[in-house]
A protein has these predicted regions:
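Conserved Rossmann-like nucleotide-cofactor binding loop
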Residues: 18, 41, 250
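Helical element adjacent to the flavin cofactor pocket in flavoenzyme catalytic cores
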Residues: 170-242, 246-251, 255
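Central helical "cap/lid" subdomain
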Residues: 231-296, 305-308
Length: 327
């Protein structure tokens, strides 16, 4: 039981995006927070690159889930404005795909209205640009015109971002219109560095890096959590009023320590990095080639990085690392 006027002690296991964000949020409120991370730095788990501001990469999910993703993405950008890579995403449907661009447009219109309503509620929600510019469609005639334009070193509008797409995809094997949407990139390295700097500046937050939590017990006498952890080859023990399991895809290990196992699904998506000669100074948007999930024609994702590097990945059985559900 927490004594009256005594500050509650919170333990967070896992310093990934969720754990670091929770520690930062509670720390800014002045709560007593201790964050345990087994690696040498925060946000060092599986890489990410995309802000799903509307969930347009996932046709399989519902409209309600897409709206939820839009709202969560806006909240995330407001909390971490410094981690955005401001580049749009282009959505392409191959001729072989069973879907149509028109089906996507219905959802995009819904998301545009939802975004407009969120801006009306709070002007600070306008983090994806103007609502009327949330997405733009391009017919083939427009793409053919852009194909003849010179590349722009620093694109400032949708048309300039679309030029390298028009020049490099096979226009005879895709459906029109092509769609550009304001789903931005996320910079993993800025997030890791920024959260570390902010957390280190908070007196109410204690960071235990390179610390492995190996046991957690419930003290029924005072209703506290006893966390045992290894740091610098020594075992330590601390007592907390609240415990947050933020261990990411290793969440099940902490569940087992608590004696409270639960079912979970972990999906791993393979990714590869390649360098494209001659594209060092070309600013590409992200490009999504839709496909049927889990088939040889699964979605392909083309994510640009500086100096002509690109991350390539897709949802097919051949490159998905694990097929079975994992604990």
């Amino acid at each position: 039981m927490i004594e009256k006027n005594k500050k509650a002690k919170i333990a967070i296991v896992g310093g990934g995006v969720a754990g670091a964000s929770a520690a930062l949020y509670f720390g800014q409120l002045g709560l007593d927070v201790t964050l345990f991370e087994k690696e040498t730095s925060l946000v060092s788990g599986p890489p990410f690159c995309h802000l799903h501001a509307g969930g347009n990469l996932y046709r399989e999910i519902s409209d309600t889930q897409c709206v939820t993703l839009l709202k969560q993405s806006i909240d995330f950008l407001r909390f971490y404005p410094f981690i955005v890579d401001y580049r749009p995403t282009v959505i392409v449907l191959p001729l072989s795909d069973s879907g149509t661009p028109e089906a996507l447009l219905l959802r995009l219109d819904l998301l545009t209205r939802e975004y407009e309503a969120l801006i009306a509620q709070d002007a600070d929600n306008k983090v994806l640009g103007e609502s009327e510019n949330y997405y733009k469609r391009y017919d083939r005639s427009e793409i053919e015109v852009l194909k003849q334009q010179e590349l722009v070193k620093t694109p400032k509008n949708c048309d300039e971002w679309m030029i390298p797409v028009a020049k490099n995809i096979d226009l005879n094997n895709v459906q029109f219109p092509l769609i550009m949407v304001q789903e931005y990139g996320l910079n993993l390295f800025r997030l890791a560095a920024g959260t570390a700097l902010m957390l280190e500046s908070l007196e109410s937050v204690t960071l235990h890096m390179e610390s492995i939590v190996h046991n957690i017990q419930k003290n029924c006498t005072n209703d506290a959590w006893i966390v045992s952890y290894l740091k610098e080859d020594k075992s330590h023990e601390e007592s907390f009023d609240y415990l947050i399991n933020a261990a990411g895809f290793r969440t099940g290990k902490i569940d087992d320590l608590l004696g409270a196992p639960c079912k979970a699904m972990v999906e791993f998506k393979a990714a590869y990095v390649s360098q494209w000669d001659g594209c060092d100074d070309t600013c590409f948007p992200e490009i999504i080639f839709h496909g049927e999930r889990g088939t040889p024609q699964g979605m392909g994702q083309f994510t640009p990085y500086p100096n002509g590097f690109f991350q390539l990945h897709g949802m097919t059985k051949e490159i998905t690392l694990y097929v079975q559900i994992l604990r």
